[in-house]
């Protein structure tokens, strides 16, 4: 039941020594503030880093040929391993754990740019030769028209799908590129679609500066024979990409007469492995944040307990008078506990709100989509649970002072100075 006199007494007691009360409350509030800010900052950094994985399947890897480092099968070291379309068919038949296999080529090699002409406009873009299944590995969103299909591959059609950046540079805003033509290395292609990606920043702009053409058309139009620049492979659900990668490498080593112990003949980039490393890193950061935050909170709660002990000692005579006038032990205990809970609760709430406001300010300052720090947020349920735990801890912090208070004999308390 609400007792106005009791609450007035609580606030009056805390206000008797404002500096002591402020410093104690600051210790508690600072602990919750630090916990929220550190967790939000960790989440913001994690969001920024993992954003790079939103455009690709994390259970995938990329594999390409390099130079052998060991002699094997009559071949000397330093031999360039050139993968072909035959390797694609072999992987498809002999590695059942590979769900998606996408052989890829890029005009001019990896990272190469090529002059593309449309009317009086010309720019340099990346030209990719791909199969339709590349969409299962890379997060490509077709915004208008369509993507490469099986008939394009079968009939070696001269069709192209352009990125939004290509559209911006070669076409007016009001123009629809679908149905128009562009020229790549003297070969005309009909535009059948426009795509965008799910990645922001520099990487998103780079990906959207690509032009996709059918793999078989690429081979014929640019005299690429049956060579494959690299493979993009996605493993089946439940099968680690590292396992599939090893199966593919073992097969290719046999097909290309490469020493099984030669680790340099094939290069790879395993997204699943990299993603797991990053998740493990941020898992460790989160544990560290909790340890530091909880340690700071515990220090604040201990401070509350110590201050309440001091307050009880200062009020020894007052407690003796109350006991002599018939105050029950529960009345004394509840008074001390309420003072501890009020001090902890108010300090925790202020720390909580200050932390959330700070995160909002940081989010506004780091609003650049190219930033590696994105959306520093914390889970509201977790925040409220932390506040409740803090208040319960505040009650616990008042138990020792409260037990000291009721242990005082009324006669001895009345004699206290």
Residues of each region from the PLM?
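Hydrophobic, regular-secondary-structure patches
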Residues: 43-126, 130-136, 151, 168-169, ...
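Short helix-coil transition/hinge motifs at the ends and kinks of transmembrane helices
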Residues: 69-77, 111-113, 200-205, 256-263, ...
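Mid-to-C-terminal secondary-structure elements
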Residues: 128, 133-152, 156-259
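Peri-transmembrane interface segments
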Residues: 232-234, 241, 247-248, 259-293
């Amino acid at each position: 039941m609400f007792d106005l006199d009791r609450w007035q007494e609580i606030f009056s007691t805390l206000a008797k020594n404002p500096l002591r009360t402020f410093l104690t409350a600051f210790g508690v509030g600072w602990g919750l503030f630090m916990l929220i800010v550190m967790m939000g900052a960790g989440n913001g950094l994690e969001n920024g880093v993992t954003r790079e994985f939103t455009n690709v399947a994390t259970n995938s890897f990329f594999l390409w040929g390099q130079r052998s480092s060991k002699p094997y099968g009559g071949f000397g070291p330093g031999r360039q391993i050139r993968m072909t379309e035959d390797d694609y068919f072999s992987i498809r038949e002999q590695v059942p754990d590979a769900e998606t296999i996408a052989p890829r080529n890029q005009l001019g090699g990896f990272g190469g740019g090529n002059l593309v002409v449309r009317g009086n406009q010309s720019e340099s873009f990346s030209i990719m030769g791909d199969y339709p299944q590349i969409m299962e590995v890379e997060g490509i969103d077709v915004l208008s028209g369509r993507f490469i299909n099986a008939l394009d591959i079968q009939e070696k059609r001269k069709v192209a799908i352009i990125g939004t950046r290509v559209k911006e540079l070669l076409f007016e805003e009001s123009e629809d590129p679908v149905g128009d033509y562009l020229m790549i290395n003297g070969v005309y292609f009909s535009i059948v679609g426009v795509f965008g990606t799910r990645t922001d920043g520099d990487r998103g702009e780079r990906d959207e500066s690509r032009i996709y053409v059918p793999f078989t058309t690429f081979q014929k139009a640019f005299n690429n024979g049956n060579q494959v620049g690299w493979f993009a492979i996605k493993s089946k659900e439940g099968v680690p990409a590292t396992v599939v990668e090893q199966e593919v490498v073992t097969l290719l080593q046999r097909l290309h007469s490469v020493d099984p112990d030669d680790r340099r003949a094939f290069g790879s980039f395993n997204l699943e492995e990299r993603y797991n490393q990053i998740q493990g890193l941020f898992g460790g950061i989160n544990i560290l944040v909790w340890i530091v935050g909880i340690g700071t909170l515990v220090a604040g709660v201990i401070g509350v307990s110590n201050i309440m002990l001091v307050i009880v000692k200062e009020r020894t005579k007052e407690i003796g008078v109350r006991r002599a006038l018939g105050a029950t032990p529960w009345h004394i205990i509840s008074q001390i506990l309420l003072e501890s809970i009020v001090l902890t609760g108010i300090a925790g709430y202020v720390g909580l709100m200050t932390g959330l406001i700070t995160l909002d300010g940081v989010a506004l300052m780091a609003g650049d989509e190219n930033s590696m720090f994105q959306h520093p947020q914390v889970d509201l349920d977790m925040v409220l649970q932390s506040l409740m735990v803090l208040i319960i801890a505040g009650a616990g912090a008042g138990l020792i002072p409260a037990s000291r208070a009721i242990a005082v004999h009324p006669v001895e308390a009345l004699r206290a100075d």
